[in-house]
Amino acid sequence: MKQLEIKNLSAAELQAKLVQLKKTYSDIKIAHAISPIENPLQIRSLRRSVARIATEISKRELL
């Protein structure tokens, strides 16, 4: 997810997206541990998206 897209989301949407991405990330990690997935770069992309959203949430709490 792009940083500009994240900035345009509301706080509730950010929380919902964070929960959704964390669940997807854990599902893919488990699937990858059992048998390798086709695109392992998807794991890195999801992990970074989770970090971007968590950072935006923290940034908004400070303001």
UniProtKB/Swiss-Prot annotation:
The keyword Transcription does not apply. PROSITE patterns: RIBOSOMAL_L29. Belongs to the universal ribosomal protein uL29 family. Keywords: Ribonucleoprotein, Ribosomal protein. It comes from the Bacteria. It comes from Flavobacterium psychrophilum (strain ATCC 49511 / DSM 21280 / CIP 103535 / JIP02/86). This is Large ribosomal subunit protein uL29. The keyword Transcription regulation does not apply. The lineage of its organism: Bacteria, Pseudomonadati, Bacteroidota, Flavobacteriia, Flavobacteriales. GO terms for molecular function: structural constituent of ribosome. GO terms for biological process: translation. GO terms for cellular component: ribonucleoprotein complex; ribosome. The gene is rpmC. Pfam families: Ribosomal_L29.
